[in-house]
Amino acid sequence: MRIALGIQYDGAAFCGWQAQPHGKTVQDRLEHALAEFARVPLHTTVAGRTDTGVHGLGQVVHFDTDLDREVFSWVRGTNAFLPSTVAVQWAKPMPETFHARFSAFERTYYYALYVHPVRSPMLAGRAGWIHTPLDDDAMRAAAAHLIGEHDFSSFRSSECQSKTPVKHLYQIDVRRVGHFVHFRFRANAFLHHMVRNLMGCLVAVGRGRYPADWLADVLAGRDRNLAAPTFMADGLYLAHVGYPAEFAVPPAQLGSVPWSSVWADLDPQS
């Protein structure tokens, strides 16, 4: 039997998703909890590996098992062995044709950026921060140059293992609410560090360091050295993974973050 799980986690507490020898990753903690509950080792396959400090609101995994358990028991039983910084949100039996990574046709990330002269300790690890004003319209104009199917080599890390740098970026939204600027990135898939590298460039434009059309030149150059430095991970959230309707994957629970009303208005499935 194939089981899919919806996972939420506080990325600030972990060294990324992928299992490591030191055991301080989300995958390590999840698989340990599953093994404790099931009394047998279970290997998970994830929709998308997140970096150190990146949060998960709508992460999806699957695993195969011969155990006959009530579906919701996978939620309650696994959570009983997880730290407070990780929680299974739902469980669902899936056909063998479902694959957490390869069945997904899109991913959505949100970035919450606190714009204020003084940093807030209450937002540490939860939102990015910049102390200088930003020009929202300039960032929107710059983002428009990135929409579509392109070679995003200028925005991939040197450690990226993707077979191709060509991705289709469907949408970038920029919305200001009070002292926050909220960004939404939706694409068929993302390269390693791609969203954080895009954020670094958008913020550089917003600060007036470059004109909006500079980003078109960076994209065309296909050279990581042309882009701005990688932006901090603190405010980045994997919000949604899109799957074909036939799998009826439950939606992510966005209400678990303070600015959920802003994000809920930006329907990740639109």
From Swiss-Prot:
EC number(s) on file: 5.4.99.12
By its UniProt entry, which InterPro entries does this protein fall under? PsdUridine_synth_cat_dom_sf, PsdUridine_synth_TruA, PsdUridine_synth_TruA_a/b_dom, PsdUridine_synth_TruA_C, TruA/RsuA/RluB/E/F_N
Cysteine disulfide partners in this protein: none
Active-site annotation: D51
Stored Pfam families: PseudoU_synth_1
Question: What's the domain of life for this entry?
Answer: Bacteria
- Residues engaged in binding substrate: Y109
Q: Which reaction does it catalyse?
A: uridine(38/39/40) in tRNA = pseudouridine(38/39/40) in tRNA
Q: Which UniProt keywords apply?
A: Isomerase, tRNA processing
- One GO molecular-function annotation for this sequence? RNA binding
Gene3D superfamilies for the chain: Pseudouridine synthase I, catalytic domain, C-terminal subdomain, Pseudouridine synthase I, catalytic domain, N-terminal subdomain
Q: Name one GO biological process term.
A: tRNA pseudouridine synthesis
Entry function:
Formation of pseudouridine at positions 38, 39 and 40 in the anticodon stem and loop of transfer RNAs.
Subunit details:
Homodimer.
Family as reported in the entry's similarity comment? Belongs to the tRNA pseudouridine synthase TruA family.
Which NCBIfam families did the record assign? hisT_truA (TIGR00071)
Q: What is this protein called?
A: tRNA pseudouridine synthase A
Query: What is the scientific name of the source organism?
Result: Burkholderia lata (strain ATCC 17760 / DSM 23089 / LMG 22485 / NCIMB 9086 / R18194 / 383)
